[in-house]
Each structure stands twice: as C-alpha cells, then as structure tokens.
Regions:
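Acidic/histidine-rich, metal-coordinating catalytic segments
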Residues: 129, 192, 200-214, 234, ...
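RNase H-like polynucleotidyl transferase catalytic core
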Residues: 150-156, 223-244, 260
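Basic, flexible linker segments flanking DNA-binding modules
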Residues: 18-29, 80-119, 139-146
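Extended, low-complexity cationic-aromatic segments
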Residues: 106-193, 293-300
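C-terminal anion-handling pockets and recognition modules
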Residues: 122-126, 133, 244-300
Length: 300
C-alpha cells in the first residue's frame, strides 16, 4: 500500500484504519461440534473400524476422520487435535481376553472378605505369593546427557536372570526366595517351608494357578502340614488381584532398581537384596499394594 493511500485511509476512516489486520487464515476443516464427536467415535475401539487390535494411532484416527467427515488431516495435526480434546498417548494395561470379569468381581466382593475373616478366626498369617524374573538387561527409565547427544549404556547381552518367589503380608512384611534356575514345584515347597519358619506357624497363602503351585508334591506337602497351610487360588488371568503384580514387583524394578546395570548374576543378587531391604523399611508402601489391587483390609 502506497503512502498516499495510507493518508487517504486515515482521512476517510480515522487512525484505526491503519492498524494491521490479522489474516483469518484457512477456515477449519471441522466445526467445533464435529470435533466433539471424535472421542465418541474412538470409544467404539479401533476394531470397530476394521483395524487389527484395539490400538489407536494418529494414522488410524486420520482414516476415521476421513471416513466419518470426508476430510483429510495430516497425522501430525491429528496429534494436536487430540491434545485439544484432552486425549493423550498412554501405555495400555494389558488384560487377557480369557478373563472372567464377573468371577474377578465376585472374588473381590465375596471371597476376599471371607479370607480375611478366616485368617482372623483361625489366627493365620495371610500371605500373597507370586513369582517374577530379574534380568541382567537393565530396565532403563531415563538419564541426562547433552542435548542432541543420545547416551549409550554398555550392557551385557544375555537372558541370564534371577527367579524370585515373593511373599507379602497384610502387616507390610516381605519374604523372598531367590534362585538362578527356573522355578518348579520343589521351590514352591521350599518357600512354603520358609514362610512357616519366619512368617507364622499357621498360614493362609493366596497365589495363582501356576503349574509349579499345582504339582502333586505340593499338595502332598500341604497335607503333611496337618492344617498349618491353607492355600487359596486366585481366579485365572487375574494378576491384578495380586498386590505383587503392579505393586511389589513394579516398585522393585522401576523404583528401587531402575537404571541398574550389573556385571553378573552375583552382583544382581546383591542389588536385589538391597532393594528388598529398602522395601521392607516401607511397610506403609507394602500395605498400599493391597489397595492398588482393589483389596480392602478394614475387615481384618
């Protein structure tokens, strides 16, 4: 615009006419009402739109928007659109399709309170048992490094690991059995014997239906205890009922032992015991694992 035209604008329309006017840009492809419909479509799940698996990606959502509204978005813009709708990328919780959700709800609502009453009535120590593996390969979380310089952690490429049995009580006590070989039924007997010696003379042990718990030798051992050990099996495909699953093991691996790189199994064994000792000093945290599993302990 020439200077003379500026003066003309100012004379005819006043000084406000000289203010810069922002460009309106392209009109949005979707209206606000259409954008609000997107979460409704996504709640139906990815498989409802013909995709394999219930995982949503920006590429898949781009196709859904095109199918529903006839407009094409770049997948990068879809990410911004989702954030605008308060949808964020998250790691999903995995659940086996074989789970019987009704049986699991019934266990929490009916069986668990009855176990608490039995433990109190029969003066048993209630112990949740579970197994897990601890590998030489580190479970890295993050570390600091100069910007744009990805750090390299040197590690020994091996599948060597420690096999661990863990016991957790309502009082916040933790017991473990660590071996460098795969666990079997004899280890189950060994751990039950250990629990009888250090946890209490009468036990109510809750564990899953693992084959190492169902061996004939285990059943025979329990019979020989003459009622000192009562075993309760969790519903199938329900590791979330065990306070070890997302509680004890998760804390040990992702808090106490995160970013840990060990040279060999002996060093890993030492670090594991140090981590367990730190966990034992936090009985309140151990007890919170029961709440995380949806198990109320007020009836104790």
């Amino acid at each position: 615009m020439s200077v003379s035209r500026w003066f003309a604008h100012a004379r005819d329309d006043g000084p406000e006419a000289l203010r810069a006017q922002p460009s309106p840009g392209r009109p949005p492809k979707l209206s606000a009402a259409q954008k609000r419909l997107i979460p409704e479509f996504l709640w139906h799940g990815a498989e409802a739109y013909g995709f394999r698996g219930q995982v949503w990606t920006c590429t898949r959502i781009t196709e859904v928007i095109e199918e529903e509204f006839g407009v094409r978005y770049h997948k990068g813009h879809v990410g911004r659109l989702l954030r605008e709708l308060h949808w964020t990328p998250q790691v999903p919780i995995r659940r086996a399709i074989q789970r019987d959700e009704k049986a699991i709800r019934r266990w929490r609502r009916e069986v668990w309170p009855e176990l608490l009453r039995r433990a109190k009535r029969e003066r048993r120590v209630l112990v949740f048992e579970d197994e897990s593996g601890f590998y030489l390969l580190p479970g890295l979380v993050r570390t600091y490094a100069p910007e744009a310089q990805t750090p390299v952690i040197r590690e020994k490429l091996t599948r060597d690991h420690l096999s661990v049995m863990g016991g957790m009580t309502l009082g916040g006590k933790v017991y473990t059995l660590v071996r460098q070989e795969s666990l079997n039924g004899l280890h189950s007997i060994e751990f039950l014997t250990h629990l009888l010696r250090v946890a209490g003379k009468r036990l109510l042990v809750v564990w899953d239906g693992s084959p190492i718990h169902r061996r004939a030798a285990v059943k025979e051992f329990v019979t020989q205890t003459k009622g000192k050990v009562w075993l309760e099996t969790l519903p199938g495909y329900a590791p979330d009922l065990n306070p070890w699953d997302e509680g004890g093991w998760h804390h040990l691996k992702n808090v106490e032992m995160r970013n840990l790189v060990c040279r060999d199994l002996e060093e890993l064994h030492q670090e594991f015991h140090l981590a367990v000792d730190r966990l034992r000093q936090k009985p309140h945290l151990v007890r919170s694992c029961f709440a995380q599993a949806g198990l109320k302990i007020q009836s104790r």
